Amino acid sequence: MITISILLMYLIVGLLTALTVLIFVFILLKFYEFRFFKQTETYQRELEQEILKINNQEELEEKLKEHYLFQSNHKVFTKRDLREIRNFFIAVLSDKILLENKNKLLSNEIIEKKKENEELKTKLDAKKVEEKITLLKEMNLTHEEAKKRLLEEYRGYVRNDLDKMVKEEEKAANDKKNAITNELNKLLINAMGNVSLLTETVRMNTVKTIKYEYVDVDPIKVKKVTDDFFGKIIGKEARNKKYIERLFNVEIIIKPESSRISISSFNTIKLEVAYNALNKIIEAVNDQGTHVLDESLIRKSWYGALNEFSAEAKRIGEETLKELGLYESAFIPTKEISEFIGRLKFRGSNTQNVLTHSIEAAQIAESIADQLNLNKEKAKVCALLHDIGKAIDKESVSSEGKWKNLKYAANDHVSAGVEIAQYYKFDIDIIDAINCHHGRKKIYEKSKNFYAKITKIADFLSAARPGVRFVKDNDIERRFDTISNILTKYVDEKIISTYKILKNGYNINLMINPDITESEYSQLTLDLKKDIESDKELSKYPITITYVQNITRSETTNAIAHAKKTVEIYSEDKAELVNDEELSTVEFLDEDI
């Protein structure tokens, strides 16, 4: 029994000893493995530093053979391990070395070739100079003549280089211009496509006629007149007629033979009020007889018509703001502006109704601002109010008028519009848009100028599109004659062979003399463009000029930047009298009533 116990004890001790030995061996192997990786890592770093000094693959292999880690008598690793490590480094690093060597060789070759080319060019230039000097000597030229010849030749070289540079710059500028033009065309096409109100030509009349029925017995007839009606309205020594014309600021033409009274005025607002006032006078005469027709009735009818007109204008303005979604807009600081907006309905510009034009411009501006990620509402207000200055007249009607100190004439509607916007404390961007839509400089430094530019574009698109304004045939003929007179000068100088005017004078095709040089062509385009833009009438339109030589080229005049006010069918602005009275927003009262 004791013997068995001893044997078991020896067995356990042996097992423990064996386990201890195994653990020791395992730890030793791990230690060597760790040391191997550390040595490998250290070697790799050393090798990378040395690679920078090595120029070819053979030197790399020799260097690796000399390293202690790759010696065959190393006791820690086998030759197979060393071979694998060596091949690994060679494969990774040799390609890099070869590529660097190749790039270096190519760089050296390029540098050498450049040097050779420069030397050859220098020698060639020197030889040319020598040949020219020799030639000049053989020609027996004086020093000054030779110097002049050389300078002329030098100028020719410079001119050729300059022409080449100009062509390159023109090509780059045209490419950039075409890219911008394409983007702008897309933007404007989208803007016009979103406009719901595209009006046609509207003829604003400067004369209104009241026609009467001459009846003595039938009191039911409307606008009936008695025998003495026309005499009474003219008055003794034409006093009543003169008083009406002075108060209404219109011209009255009485035609008893045709039972008509015509009212004439270039101020369409005054024309509308005078028409309504005269109808009130006639109604009073119909109801009470001609004995009531005196200055008191005339004043009462005039001021009553003024108040009715103000109320109607305010209603139209409020409806306009509601239709555009601006009635509660934060950019409309007061509803009093509604009356001035409504007055635009009774104004015309080149046969285009100003209110309709303003609404259309507002819709275009909104679409443009939407595509540019700007404030659509502000852009819409800017365009709607850009012609608001056309809603007022020259002077105030009474001391109660808000605009009694406004001395701007109606034809300077920009200044008047700025005055209105500043009085009602509109946003500075809106004020500057009103001020700048005809090319003026902005008033406020902090205002955002792109709203003014959008307003100007919207105004132009609405006013200039085909069909919106009436054009007389003699205007087209006059435009053709003006263009022909300008082009004839260049035909006489044999720069232009022939020309053709197309599209009512908006397109001009020119056949250029094939013998002219590039510099002469450039000068022709500049001179012709300047001649067209300096003409008062032609500067109002963008005219495209196509030049035909060996290749086709196209130039467009920038007429819009120099455009003056267009010719109107009637001139409501120029017909303003010095004593013209303003229709202010106050209530009009007759002191005698």
From Swiss-Prot:
Record membrane topology: Single-pass membrane protein
A biological process from GO: mRNA catabolic process
SMART domains reported for this sequence: HDc, KH
Main location: membrane
Record flagged with keyword Transmembrane helix: yes
Keywords for this protein: Cell membrane, Endonuclease, Hydrolase, Membrane, Nuclease, RNA-binding, Transmembrane, Transmembrane helix
GO molecular function terms noted in the UniProt entry: RNA binding; RNA endonuclease activity
InterPro entries linked to this entry: Diverse_Catalytic_Enzymes, HD/PDEase_dom, HD_domain, HDIG_dom, KH_dom, KH_dom_type_1_sf, Ribonuclease_Y
Transmembrane is among the record's keywords: yes
Residue ranges of domain HD in the record: 354-464
Coiled coil: none
Record's GO cellular component terms: plasma membrane
TM region positions: 6-26
Subcellular location: Cell membrane
Enzyme class of the recorded protein, top EC level: hydrolase
HAMAP family referenced in this protein's UniProt entry, alphabetically: RNase_Y
Family: Belongs to the RNase Y family.
Record function comment: Endoribonuclease that initiates mRNA decay.
Protein name per its UniProtKB record: Ribonuclease Y
